[in-house]
Amino acid sequence: MTIRDATLSDSAEIAALTTQLGYPTETDAITGRLAKIAGQREQLVLVAVLENTVAGWLQAHACEVIESGFRAEILGLVVGQSCRRQGVGRRLVARAEQWAIEIGAETLVVRSNTKRVESHSFYPALGFQASKTQAVYRKRLEADPNQFLRQRPIGDLGR
């Protein structure tokens, strides 16, 4: 098994895995998202490759949080159904943890949907501790997702 940075050529397999997880996604959408975050130091997108096939992917990002400091967070982790229980997820998380340490993150956070029962034993087995239960609220916005790229640099608070 090889763990490596995702590339645009992985888009179709990442889309298929994402759809398998229950989030139907088109290849073009994944390609566009990967292109937007390519080269951003605070973003990490990895794939696990088994026998020339993407068996899983992980996305993490790092940010400074006012109340809790600099942290990394796993935003998504998907392992194909046929590749589960083979160490794919464990290896992806280990690489994300290594990255988080390298960039100086104080903690690595992951959120897990309550309906993903398997993950509730997976993360504690890797040393994660449940820290809270929360409700997540979402509001769909009518916005141009490319607008962010045209905004002032992050960190410029109008000084």
Predicted regions, residues:
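Conserved N-terminal entry element of GNAT/NAT acetyltransferase domains
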Residues: 1-9, 143-159
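Acetyl-CoA-dependent GNAT
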Residues: 5-70, 75, 80, 156-157
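Conserved amphipathic alpha-helical interaction elements at protein-protein interfaces in regulatory
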Residues: 20, 85, 98-102, 129
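Short coil/turn motifs at secondary-structure junctions
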Residues: 62-65, 79-82, 115-117, 142-144
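Conserved acetyl-CoA-binding loop-helix of GNAT-fold acetyltransferases
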Residues: 79, 85-98, 125
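Conserved active-site alpha-helix within GNAT-family acetyltransferase domains
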Residues: 90, 102, 114-133, 139
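Conserved GNAT acetyl-CoA-binding A-motif
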Residues: 93, 100-112
